[in-house]
Swiss-Prot record:
GO terms for biological process: thiamine diphosphate biosynthetic process. CDD domains: ThiG. Catalyzes the rearrangement of 1-deoxy-D-xylulose 5-phosphate (DXP) to produce the thiazole phosphate moiety of thiamine. Sulfur is provided by the thiocarboxylate moiety of the carrier protein ThiS. In vitro, sulfur can be provided by H(2)S. It comes from Acinetobacter baumannii (strain ATCC 17978 / DSM 105126 / CIP 53.77 / LMG 1025 / NCDC KC755 / 5377). The active site is at K102 (schiff-base intermediate with dxp). It is found in: Cytoplasm. Keywords: Cytoplasm, Schiff base, Thiamine biosynthesis, Transferase. Pfam families: ThiG. This is Thiazole synthase.
Length: 261
């Protein structure tokens, strides 16, 4: 069965796995893991990674060239709307007018849970300034709807806390967000292993974004390959339509036409 592309804002993608660039041991490992993942969208923390701000330091764009990947600047490390807006403005300047950004405004350093009040404020400002916003948010369906109605091009509810590896803790609310949404819904944060990615896709999500699950694995390149397969398998399972759940057994062999009685 031929799948449709993933459409985010004005862009089209074949891969439904998005990856980050943090926590790798060096740029070579970063490069190899991203290649193994098959990802087309690579997210970059503007406040933490050099993409041209410092000419004396290694430039991440040497291994993720913008002509090969869609670079998705993110506002990781921002705890209020103003700093998130400033970070997006810097990203646009560094990337020659690039308007697609991942907005995340965090509530505290312990949980890195999204501050939805500041997120809404920043999203409104950035959308008014012409940005296409993919937004990290809680798994609250009402907040997700509000972010979509104001013009965000993708909703990215957390599966569980950033870097926790706890998987999809509230699949029911993720499902509600997806059912209500008219823009792509991508699970962002909390994926720990391939089965978590497959579950997110089986719920009907349009994609999964991850970083630590790959970078912190004992073999990041192999894990990146596993995540690619998991996202593809989960997507195919969703499109195929799972069998209904039943309380009692239902024999797979026919009850008539026995050879022996």
């Amino acid at each position: 069965m031929q799948d449709t592309p993933l459409i985010i804002g004005s862009r089209s993608f074949q891969s439904r796995l998005l990856v980050g660039t943090g926590k790798y041991k060096d740029l070579n490992e970063t490069d190899l893991a991203i290649q193994a993942s098959g990802a087309e969208i690579v997210t970059v923390a503007i406040r933490r990674v050099n993409i041209g701000q410092n000419p004396d330091q290694p430039n991440l764009l040497s291994v993720i060239p913008p002509e090969k990947y869609t670079i998705l600047p993110n506002t990781a490390g921002c705890f209020d709307a103003d700093s998130a807006v400033r970070t997006c403005m810097l990203a646009r300047e560094l990337l020659d007018g690039h308007n697609l950004v991942k907005l995340e405004v965090l509530g505290d350093e312990k949980t890195l849970y999204p501050n939805v009040t500041e997120t809404l404020k920043a999203a409104r400002t950035l959308i008014d300034d012409g940005f296409e916003i993919m937004v990290y948010t809680s798994d609250d369906p009402i907040i997700a709807q509000e972010l979509e109605s104001m013009g965000c091009v993708a909703i990215m509810p957390l599966g569980s806390l950033i870097g926790s590896g706890l998987g999809i803790l509230n699949p029911h609310t993720i499902s509600i967000i997806k059912e209500n949404a008219k823009v792509p819904v991508l699970v962002d944060a909390g994926v720990g292993t391939a089965s978590d990615a497959a579950i997110a896709m089986e719920l009907g999500c349009d994609g999964v974004l991850m970083n630590t699950a790959i970078a912190a694995a004992q073999n990041p390149i192999l894990m990146a390959s596993a995540m690619k397969k998991a996202v593809e398998a989960g997507r195919e399972a969703f499109l195929a339509g799972r069998m209904p759940r039943k309380r009692m057994a239902n024999a797979s062999s026919p009850e008539t036409g026995y050879f022996f009685k």
